[in-house]
Amino acid sequence: MDKFKEIRPIVLGIAKNNNRLLVSEGYDKVKDSTFYRCLGGGIEFQEKSYEALKREFLEEIGKEISVKDFLGVSENIFTFEGKKAHELIFFYSAELKEEDYQEEYVMDEDGKVNKAVWIDINEFKSNKSIVYPTEVLKYI
């Protein structure tokens, strides 16, 4: 089934360090808009959300995390590159091991190379930079 025509369960990790949030950069060509999103991804059938978060961090940046507190669930109905989407998002606080902190991480997702970076939380709170879903702002 087309992932844009179903409700997709995902999990996102709120990883903070020195008032900075670990995010990956995204770009919507239709809106000509750059945005940021916390790391995480889809929850597979019969997979616990916190297990999916650990798997996603390992897949995305090659680092193990400690999943800390469950922060909440949010429903996200949005349009990305002209396509309507619907997500049910589980939020957790997450921590990397001290020795695994880097200024940026190279991400390779299915051949698409991107990077994860630490952005000052005030950039998002002051609306200088956009973080999606906006519910992230409640947890930072």
Regions found by a protein language model. Give the residues of each.
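Short, well-ordered beta-strand micro-motif
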Residues: A15, F91-E95, D120
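Structural motif
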Residues: L21, E87-I89, A116
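Conserved Nudix-box catalytic region and its N-terminal flanking loop in Nudix hydrolases
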Residues: R20-E59
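Conserved N-terminal beta-strand and adjoining loop/helix that marks the start
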Residues: M1-L22, K68
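A short coil-to-beta-strand element that immediately follows conserved catalytic motifs
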Residues: E64-V73
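Active-site-adjacent beta-strand/loop module that shapes the phosphate/pyrophosphate-binding cleft
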Residues: F78-E103
